[in-house]
């Protein structure tokens, strides 16, 4: 195989249990987001926009829709050997060594595919998660990795201490070399001088290739290991003296974007997913989807334009502060602060507000829907209310989150 300078490895095998029922029939990175995208699209765009074109996507859990999406819509030409996005399903590649096991953790997923790294002989390996919403110039992080002569570089993001229990938490010295790593601690240590904030690992790493091999081979021999980067590999690397540095995500320059890079969302819970979706409908969103110099590619499905019809009395088709995909029809209803995916139809006298409606949802007449996520292929009968009586919503079998967001599963029948 052809040699490359930087090899991308995207971890896309997560089960995403905290996103259930959105992950009942799809992998977490395949969950739709932003009216036309899937979550995996954002990290793929980051690699491609950064000029890193040699990418493997490691899959495992309910990967069919993710596989189809990438195979159909993320294809380079056939004539450039160093330009590829290839899916790598869990396949017990080290069966003779490990026995009949799937990926046992994030580190093991890479370990079981080290032969792919070896084939390309890269100078650095970029190991990124496939389930975050952000823009990142990965090339800038790679250059920082080279400049610091790091063995491992970890992208870092300041978060409130109260939220840091969901992340790996970093302690750094004045040169941003990491001195301690805590994986999802119960009592996160704050950033020195900022007692209300902690420095969170974004789960995105750049490895010197030789260091990656050394660390993963040692981890595979450790029968007590969880075979996870955050739980074992990174803390051990710091402990035994590898050069492990934090990279300040806020200093990451995005072409066409002024000021610090502030937006990164781990959409690993239903409430986090919902809030990230609501971020998009703000008048001036921090995370914008429209940039000619940092394009966000996804499937081109050739949907017809969105359509708004009727303007008689209260029967007015309109959408305010919302994102609408192709094929949406708002027929005499009102949509406010919402995200509507392809071919959604909102019929007359209905109100949809602060909600996310996936492909092919139809809202009957005189419905009221608020603070909801409705998965694909749901037909809502006339006069239905969702998000107004949470006990009734629970009785219907809907999920109600701690923040009161109602989630209707795919294909639900009333």
Swiss-Prot record:
Alpha-D-glucose 1-phosphate binds at residues 103, 168, 183-184, 201. It catalyses: alpha-D-glucose 1-phosphate + ATP + H(+) = ADP-alpha-D-glucose + diphosphate. Gene3D superfamilies: Hexapeptide repeat proteins, Spore Coat Polysaccharide Biosynthesis Protein SpsA, Chain A. CDD domains: ADP_Glucose_PP, LbH_G1P_AT_C. Its EC number is 2.7.7.27. Belongs to the bacterial/plant glucose-1-phosphate adenylyltransferase family. InterPro entries: ADP-Glc_PPase, ADP_Glu_pyroP_CS, GlgC_bac, GlmU/GlgC-like_hexapep, NTP_transferase_dom, Nucleotide-diphossugar_trans, Trimer_LpxA-like_sf. Homotetramer. It comes from the Bacteria. Involved in the biosynthesis of ADP-glucose, a building block required for the elongation reactions to produce glycogen. Catalyzes the reaction between ATP and alpha-D-glucose 1-phosphate (G1P) to produce pyrophosphate and ADP-Glc. This is Glucose-1-phosphate adenylyltransferase. Pfam families: Hexapep_GlmU, NTP_transferase. Keywords: ATP-binding, Carbohydrate metabolism, Glycogen biosynthesis, Glycogen metabolism, Nucleotide-binding, Nucleotidyltransferase, Transferase. Pathway: Glycan biosynthesis; glycogen biosynthesis. GO terms for molecular function: ATP binding; glucose-1-phosphate adenylyltransferase activity. GO terms for biological process: glycogen biosynthetic process.
């Amino acid at each position: 195989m052809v040699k490359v300078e930087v090899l991308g490895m995207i971890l896309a095998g997560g089960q995403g249990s905290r996103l259930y029922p959105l992950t009942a029939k799809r992998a977490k990175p395949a969950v739709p987001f932003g009216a036309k995208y899937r979550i995996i699209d954002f990290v793929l765009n980051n690699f491609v926009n950064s000029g890193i074109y040699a990418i493997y996507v490691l899959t495992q859990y309910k990967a069919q829709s993710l596989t189809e999406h990438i195979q159909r819509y993320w294809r380079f030409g056939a004539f450039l050997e160093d330009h590829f996005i290839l899916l790598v399903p869990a396949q017990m590649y080290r069966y003779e060594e490990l026995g009949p096991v799937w990926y046992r953790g994030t580190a093991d997923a890479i370990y079981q595919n080290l032969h792919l790294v070896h084939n390309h002989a890269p100078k650095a390996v970029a190991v990124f998660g496939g389930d975050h919403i952000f823009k990142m110039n990965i090339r800038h992080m790679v250059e920082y990795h080279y400049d610091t002569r790091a063995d491992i570089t970890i992208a870092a993001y300041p978060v409130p201490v109260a939220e840091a229990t969901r992340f790996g938490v970093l302690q750094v010295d004045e040169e941003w070399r990491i001195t301690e790593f805590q994986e999802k601690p119960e009592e996160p240590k704050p950033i020195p001088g900022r007692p209300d904030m902690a420095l969170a690992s974004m789960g995105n790493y750049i490895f010197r290739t030789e260091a990656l091999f050394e660390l993963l081979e040692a981890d595979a021999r450790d029968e007590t290991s969880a075979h996870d980067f955050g739980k074992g590999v990174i803390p051990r690397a710091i402990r035994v003296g590898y050069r492990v540095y934090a990279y300040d995500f806020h200093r990451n320059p995005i072409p066409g974007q002024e000021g610090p890079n502030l937006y990164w969302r781990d959409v690993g819970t239903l409430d986090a997913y919902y809030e990230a979706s609501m971020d998009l409908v703000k008048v001036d969103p921090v995370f914008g989807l429209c940039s000619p110099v940092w394009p966000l590619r996804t499937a081109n499905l050739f949907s017809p334009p969105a359509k708004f019809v009727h303007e008689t009395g209260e029967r007015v088709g309109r959408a305010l502060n919302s994102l609408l995909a192709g094929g949406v029809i708002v027929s005499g209803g009102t949509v406010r602060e919402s995200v509507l995916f392809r071919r959604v139809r909102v019929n007359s006298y209905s109100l949809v507000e602060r909600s996310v409606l996936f492909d092919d949802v139809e809202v009957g007449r005189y419905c009221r829907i608020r603070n909801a996520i409705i998965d694909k292929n749901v037909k809502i009968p006339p006069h239905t209310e969702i998000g107004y009586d949470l006990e009734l919503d629970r009785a219907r079998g809907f999920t109600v989150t701690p923040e009161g967001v109602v989630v209707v599963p795919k294909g639900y029948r009333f």
